């Protein structure tokens, strides 16, 4: 029985990953860099510390601090203008969880300021009992720490939690946390390699409701 649901944010609750890919590429061009989409997809679900190390290893001379600050300004501007919408089915699933009295949390590798801004501007921040973020304090997904911390805040054993994710790093983190895991793919499609980490795959968040 699902006693709590823990959501990733980017690409799962909010349609921010698609916007973020073009954003990081635009910010890279400010430094004369052409950052391939395929590389950016490898960083999805990772903390800024972890993804920053990947950028430094692959783009010698890059100013990662500047890149991430330019990106933060770009994305926060989008959020403030209401240009980062919720993903399809998000409200329907949150309504279903409310109706059943199932608490939910957000477990995101993004910075806390960013997570709270996106959720607030999307009108759903108050619907989560806990918001747990990476931001360098906790190990990056696929480590389970962010999910485990969210479960602790909810007071629910990990085995009774459903982790919802859209990325490879995310589903691995949910499985490592000992949770039931559902994947709702966004930019990264489901593949057989991810099957060991997923209990089910859904086309959008509303399709999760009958699987609770």
Where are these regions (language model features)?
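Conserved SAM-binding loop
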Residues: 13, 86, 104-107, 163-164
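Helix-loop "lid/cap" segments that line or gate small-molecule binding pockets
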Residues: 27-28, 47-61, 118, 150-151
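Short beta->alpha linker loops
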Residues: 19, 46-47, 85-89, 110, ...
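Active-site neighborhood of HAD-like aspartate-dependent phosphohydrolases
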Residues: 1-42
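Asp-based, Mg2+/Mn2+-dependent phosphohydrolase catalytic module
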Residues: 1-3, 95-98, 111-212
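Metal-dependent phosphoesterase signature
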Residues: 54-92, 100
């Amino acid at each position: 029985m699902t006693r709590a649901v823990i959501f990733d944010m980017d690409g799962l609750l909010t349609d921010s990953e698609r916007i973020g890919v073009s954003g990081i590429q635009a910010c890279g061009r400010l430094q004369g860099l052409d950052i391939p989409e395929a590389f950016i997809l490898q960083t999805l679900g990772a903390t800024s510390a972890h993804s920053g190390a990947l950028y430094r290893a692959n783009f010698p001379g890059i100013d990662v601090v500047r890149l991430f600050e330019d990106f933060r300004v770009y994305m926060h501007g989008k959020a403030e203008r209401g240009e980062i919408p919720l993903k399809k089915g998000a409200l329907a699933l949150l309504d279903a969880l409310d109706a059943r009295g199932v608490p939910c949390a957000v477990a995101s590798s993004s910075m806390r300021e960013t997570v709270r801004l996106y959720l607030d501007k999307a009108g759903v921040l108050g619907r989560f009992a806990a918001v747990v973020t990476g931001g360098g304090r906790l190990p990056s997904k696929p480590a389970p720490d962010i999910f485990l911390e969210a479960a602790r805040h909810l007071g629910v054993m990990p085995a009774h939690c459903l982790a919802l994710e859209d990325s490879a790093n995310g589903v691995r983190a949910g499985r490592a946390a000992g949770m039931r895991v559902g994947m709702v793919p966004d930019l990264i499609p489901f593949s057989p390699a991810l099957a060991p980490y997923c209990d089910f795959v859904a086309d959008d968040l509303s399709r999760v409701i009958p699987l609770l």
